[in-house]
Amino acid sequence: MAGEDRVEQESSVPADVREKHALLAEQIEEHRFRYYVKDQPVVSDADFDRQLRSLEALEEEHPSLRTPDSPTQKVAGPYRTEFTSVEHRERMLSLDNAFDDEELAAWADRVAKDVGTPDHHFLCELKVDGLAVNLTYEHGRLTRAATRGDGRTGEDITPNVRTIAEIPHRLKGEDIPALVEIRGEVFFPMEDFEELNARLVAADDKPFANPRNAAAGSLRQKDPKVTATRPLHMVVHGIGAHEGLSIDRLSAAYDLLHTWGLPTARHNKVVDSLAGVREFIAHYGENRHSVEHEIDGVVVKLDEIPLQGRLGSTSRAPRWAIAWKYAPEEVNTKLVNIRVGVGRTGRVTPYAQVEPVEVAGSEVEFATLHNQNVVKAKGVLIGDTVVIRKAGEVIPEILGPVVDLRDGTEKAFEMPTHCPECGTELRPMKEADIDLRCPNARTCPAQLRERVFYLAGRKSLDIDHFGYVAAAALTRPLEPAEPVLKDESDLFSLTVEQLLPIRAYVLDQDSGLPKRDPKTGEEKIATVFANQQGEPKKNAVAMLEGIAAAKDAPLARVLTGLSIRHVGPVAAQELARQFRSIERIDEATEEELAAADGVGPTIAASVKQWFAEDWHREIVRKWREAGVRMADEGSDEDEGPRPLEGLTVVVTGTLAGHTRDGAKEALQALGAKVAGSVSKKTAFVVVGDNPGSKYDKAMQLKVPVLDEDGFAILLEQGPERAKEAALPVPEAAPAADPENSGE
């Protein structure tokens, strides 16, 4: 009877009073949450008390509004996530996978056959590598968030999900359905992952093995205040149960989610054929690291919702969708050892030797660890099972250990005190430096090998057929006993007769260790430059021709190749432009160097320190005698116009008419600064094929974007005409589309 009385009493409360009560209750709950969980109150205590008293007054006047769920009946205090089991109104299904084109084509054929009409489309989405979450909105208000669980039942994580800034507590706009379940993926950005693990290790807590585990662990905190400190993000990619919502196309549904204020992604595409699907998959296979989160594949869905219903589902997955999986970029393997390598400037860097494993389509045996502090911050021990990641062309890296698999035999890494190749005691260059360095720059074989390899490389003299094996053979051969190159000064005096007798280990570029024969396990040794008849190999002849051609290299490339600390291609370009010859750079005071545009005191000091060494001067002397051009032609007055002086330009994508380096050099020659990221200070963004996220950022910031024709106008006619040729900027950002985890 009491329940019936309450219903009768509630029905007697005017609608506007009930609405005012509901709004006040929601606002008070939100203020409590911001105060106790996020430590970000947006109202004063007095304003909060005033709202609470208003709610109490309404309930005093209308007692039927005073329910156990009312803020007036609950004690305010710390929130706690209990992880109680909750049932999804509509099942969260998984997805079937396609690992090759044959499986993808077979699925597309089945779809075409079952829908019975050629008039259908595919919606291609990126597959986010995160944790699947189901959001329930009732009358536009977020009432529950739950994990996927077994698809039918998940865990209630509402207080934790409410800490994610991107997830609206109330949907925007009109025509909000009475009920809607929103499916999406919570992820942990890679750039924040290492920082979190370092904090955990410093606090003697277990580190996470990878960003996905970090996202899951962050959502499973009993105290939402902890979750609130984690930089979690979400993208939505589907709709579950709903009332009062009618829509025919999934792509249109995503546009609707965006208008409601939900975090959707921008990389989806509707195509009308399998060829379009393949093109989308290929594009993001090459550009998967240009998006703002980790992806491990592409989800392909039938876009027409009525046709989805016709195809139905199996017990675990819809027949109208499939997940194309890229080769995995994260795998588990054993950390066999931690070694150290010596770079061209003497920096000693730890690296991981792991049991060989296939990652992202290639075999990996070594991974970077940067420095001893990173080893400590990652919490890895020799003997650990670790998660290794290889992202595109990036050097493989260790993400973290799988702590639960430790058996007690693991041991900590200790940084060596002496150089592993020359035995010199290691020390930091300055007292506060993290890195240890080998100070034996002249005779340390590792430093010489790395400097010579860099000198011949694409950023420096760009000598054909002069790779890592050649650099190692010339600087530390097995035969003859003495190296042909004792330092860089010998480079331009090399002869074919010197090359022929050289035998050396075939070294691995990642580790500096000899490669091994896969059949015998023995270290590989080769006669590097001569064939079996004792005649010079074609690559040896080509290498000597490349060395001769490098004598005419621009001054900037010569400066880059000298491995002066802090002088990379950009600084070398500025030094060459402003001083014109190596003699004038040598003669300039530190103050004169520091005053030059783009140089500054750090580079200036490093340049003067380099020229203070007699053996460095000997390199310059012998190169000059060999005919190396040590000055750019012309005087300062002859330099020519610099119409792009002071402008910052970003180049992205593949240009048909220029290499990336060629485009940069053309811009720098006209005075432009070439940057790697887009900001409000960017003057132009030059885009080729597959430009990635920099194009999107430029459009968002309304930075002029030039295609190849526009780039030619910029170089030939200047910035004002180039602005006229810029690609049109949309009035508003394109409608966002969601990512998909393929639960």
UniProtKB/Swiss-Prot annotation:
UniProt lists the family membership as follows: Belongs to the NAD-dependent DNA ligase family. LigA subfamily.
Q: Where is the BRCT domain?
A: 639-728
Function of the protein: DNA ligase that catalyzes the formation of phosphodiester linkages between 5'-phosphoryl and 3'-hydroxyl groups in double-stranded DNA using NAD as a coenzyme and as the energy source for the reaction. It is essential for DNA replication and repair of damaged DNA.
What processes does the entry annotate via GO biological process terms? DNA repair; DNA replication
Q: Which residues bind NAD(+)?
A: 45-49, 94-95, 125, 148, 185, 301, 325
The answer to whether keyword DNA damage applies is: yes
Which SUPFAM superfamilies does this entry report, sorted A to Z? Answer: BRCT domain, DNA ligase/mRNA capping enzyme, catalytic domain, Nucleic acid-binding proteins, RuvA domain 2-like
Q: What is its EC number?
A: 6.5.1.2
Q: Which species does the entry assign this protein to? A: Streptomyces griseus subsp. griseus (strain JCM 4626 / CBS 651.72 / NBRC 13350 / KCC S-0626 / ISP 5235)
Which segments of the protein form a coiled coil according to its record? none
**What is this organism's lineage?**
Bacteria, Bacillati, Actinomycetota, Actinomycetes, Kitasatosporales
InterPro entries, per the entry: BRCT_dom (IPR001357), BRCT_dom_sf (IPR036420), DisA/LigA_HHH (IPR041663), DNA_ligase (IPR001679), DNA_ligase_AS (IPR018239), DNA_ligase_CS (IPR033136), DNAligase_adenylation (IPR013839), DNAligase_N (IPR013840)
Q: What is this protein called?
A: DNA ligase 2
Q: Which residues form the signal peptide?
A: none
Cofactor(s) this protein requires: Mg(2+); Mn(2+)
Here the segments flagged for biased composition (Low complexity) are: 725-743
Q: Quote the catalytic activity from the record.
A: NAD(+) + (deoxyribonucleotide)n-3'-hydroxyl + 5'-phospho-(deoxyribonucleotide)m = (deoxyribonucleotide)n+m + AMP + beta-nicotinamide D-nucleotide
- Alphabetic keyword roster: DNA damage, DNA repair, DNA replication, Ligase, Magnesium, Manganese, Metal-binding, NAD, Zinc
| GO CC, one annotated term | cytosol
Q: Which residues bind Zn(2+)?
A: 419, 422, 438, 444
